[in-house]
Each structure stands twice: as C-alpha cells, then as structure tokens.
Amino acid sequence: MSDISCKKRDDYLEWPEYFMAVAFLSAQRSKDPSSQVGACIVNTENKIVGIGYNGMPNGCSDDLLPWRRTAENKLDTKYPYVCHAELNAIMNKNSADVKGCSMYVALFPCNECAKLIIQAGIKEVIFMSDKYHDSEETTAARLLFKLAGVTFRKFTPKYSKIVIDFDSINSRPSQKPQ
C-alpha cells in the first residue's frame, strides 16, 4: 500500500474554521450593498442546524425596499426593514429547537439579535468582528449575554482565506508518494 492511501491530509478544515466559513459563504447571499453578514448555528454534535444572512423579510421585494444606510427619514433606510443574519439563522433552523447550540457569526450581534439568541436557548456565540464594540447596541448585547449566561468569544482563524475552487474536483490526485 502506498503512503498516499495511508495518511490523511493535513490541510483539512477543522470544525471551527468550517462553521465560520459556512457563515461567511452564507453572507454572500445578502443583497445588501454595504454589509454582508452570515450566521451558522451548530449543535453539540457538530451538525449545522441553521444558516442565515442579512436580507429583507420573506415576501418583501428587495427591489422595492431601500438599501441605503443614511437618509433624512429613517424609513428611507434599510434599518427598519432588514432582518439580521442571526434572526434568519434561528428562523431557518432545521431542528425542533436550538437550545444548547453555538452560533458562528461574522459580526458581534446587536441587542435585538442578542435577545433572540437568548430566547432561542443558544449558549455560545463565536464572532469574527466586533467593529461596533462601542455602540449602545453591542454594549447592551454583551450585558444581556452575561446576565443570561451566554458565552461569547472572538474567533481567531488559522487561515486568513479559504478558497473554493470548483475546478479542483476534476483534477486527478498525484500517484507519487510524498
């Protein structure tokens, strides 16, 4: 038997990188021109039970609602209408409940999403960026998480990029031992 067939590869994605990558890939579905955020809910058996990204509510045309960040009238911005990735991941769950699960998310959740996360029974939030750390919304979210016993931590990736190469499936493995 050759060495190739006896040794697993070393550069595979470990679970945390995989789940955060799924959150980031999901974010690519967002039509928001300024913020693409994804979330991935995982149970204790490392099974994905929910995925979501930021977007307009089901049945509401994203061609008719505004995507701008600022306007004189708040109703002319995206903020009263858009559903955050965390909400969509919880609503899109493929399991009876998400109690005890972990959520991987690109951005630290706002206070409204923190309330949903707590009510859903999610026990851990792993986030990539906390760029709004000093905002009232994320300050309130951190307080809510602490009071409810939801742990949160910043994700430190092993790789700065994960490339999806659709052509790689067509290449043949090398027959030379390494």
Curated annotation (Swiss-Prot):
The modification Phosphoserine is found at residue 174. One of its GO terms (molecular function) is zinc ion binding. The active site is at residue 86. One of its GO terms (biological process) is nucleoside salvage. Its EC number is 3.5.4.12. Zn(2+) binds at residues 84, 110, 113. Its cofactor is Zn(2+). The keyword Phosphoprotein applies. It comes from the Eukaryota. GO terms for cellular component: cytoplasm. Residues 14-145 form the CMP/dCMP-type deaminase domain. Gene3D superfamilies: Cytidine Deaminase, domain 2 (3.40.140.10). InterPro entries: APOBEC/CMP_deaminase_Zn-bd, CMP_dCMP_dom, Cytidine_deaminase-like, dCMP_deaminase, dCMP_deaminase-rel, Deoxycytidylate_deaminase_dom. Catalyzes the deamination of dCMP to dUMP, providing the nucleoside monophosphate substrate for the thymidylate synthase/TYMS. Also, part of a nucleotide salvage pathway that eliminates epigenetically modified 5-hydroxymethyl-dCMP (hmdCMP) in a two-step process entailing deamination to cytotoxic 5-hydroxymethyl-dUMP (hmdUMP), followed by its hydrolysis into 5-hydroxymethyluracil (hmU) and 2-deoxy-D-ribose 5-phosphate (deoxyribosephosphate). Catalyzes the first step in that pathway, the deamination of 5-hydroxymethyl-dCMP (hmdCMP). Homohexamer. Belongs to the cytidine and deoxycytidylate deaminase family. PANTHER family: DEOXYCYTIDYLATE DEAMINASE, DEOXYCYTIDYLATE DEAMINASE-RELATED. This is Deoxycytidylate deaminase.
